[in-house]
Structures are given as structure tokens and as C-alpha cells.
Amino acid sequence: MSRKNRAPKRDVLPDPLYNSQLVTRLINRVMLDGKRGTAASIVYGAFEQIKEATGNDALEVFETAMENIMPVLEVRARRVGGSNYQVPVKVRPERRTTLGLRWLVTIARLRGEHTMQDRLAKEILDAANNTGAAVKKREDTHRMAEANRAFAHFRW
């Protein structure tokens, strides 16, 4: 491991269409093999579908969905006296967003719809309505943290 200082966090530029850093991060997460244009068209197309389906602003629906996906607690493994405990800890704000986007895109890729644009749009709509696999993933994470609440005093 490097002995030098940790690399500074780089700011993400807001995307030109919605002027939102969150949308840029979603595009970066959807992007494969450096094809940003393709990723952007997928995300913007999904947002158009969301706008048609709901009649509301797609960015607001997306932000609601992200709030429903982002975890507040998670468990981390901690070794104490020869055994590993799953210790519940609060999730830092930056990691909350990262996990939410990661879960959203991963689960959208696993859906059965024909195009990625459809999958992403449907998963965002499901998450905004507090249903769908991404919200279930968050609930499972919270359930794990609640089940291991007895080990909370091992926090560091």
C-alpha cells in the first residue's frame, strides 16, 4: 500500500441537461468501456420515459427514488477475540449515494425488459414508489444492521 497521502476527491461536474451532479454520477455508473455518449443517451432516454409515465419532473422522481434506495445503516465485519462480528455502523453521506447508485444500476441490469433504457426507467419508477429490488436491497441491509444491534458497542 502507498505511504503517500490519500488522493484528493475530484469534483463531479453537473450534467448539462439537468444541472445535477447526481445525474452525472448515474451516467458514470451506467457507462461501460468509456462510452459516455451511449451512457448519457440511456440515462436521458430513461428520464424521458419517466416524465411520460408520471407527468412529473424526471429529476424529482429520480431524487425520490434515490432517497428510498440509499441506506442509513450497514454492517461491517470486526474481528474481536478470534471471532468476526457484524457490527452495525452509520453510512457516510458520500457512501450512501455511491451504494444507492451502485444498487440501482446493478439491479436495473438484471431486469427483464428489452433495453437498458427501459430497465433503468422501470427500476427508478419502482424505487420512487418504494417497491422494487433496489429498495428491497436497502431493507435487507437495514434488517441485517437491526439483527446485529447487540454488537453495536464494538463500533470503532
Swiss-Prot record:
Statement: the UniProt record of this protein carries the keyword Ribosomal protein: yes
Gene Ontology biological-process entries: translation
GO CC terms in record: small ribosomal subunit
Disulfide bonds: none
The keyword Ribosomal protein appears for this protein: yes
Pfam families tied to this protein: Ribosomal_S7
Keywords (A to Z) from UniProt: Ribonucleoprotein, Ribosomal protein, RNA-binding, rRNA-binding, tRNA-binding
Gene3D superfamilies (UniProt xref): Ribosomal protein S7 domain
Matches recorded under InterPro entries: Ribosomal_uS7, Ribosomal_uS7_bac/org-type, Ribosomal_uS7_CS, Ribosomal_uS7_dom, Ribosomal_uS7_dom_sf
Any one GO MF annotation of this record: structural constituent of ribosome
Record text on subunit structure and interactions: Part of the 30S ribosomal subunit. Contacts proteins S9 and S11.
Main function: One of the primary rRNA binding proteins, it binds directly to 16S rRNA where it nucleates assembly of the head domain of the 30S subunit. Is located at the subunit interface close to the decoding center, probably blocks exit of the E-site tRNA.
Record-stated family: Belongs to the universal ribosomal protein uS7 family.
Name of the protein this chain belongs to: Small ribosomal subunit protein uS7
Organism: Streptococcus pneumoniae serotype 4 (strain ATCC BAA-334 / TIGR4)
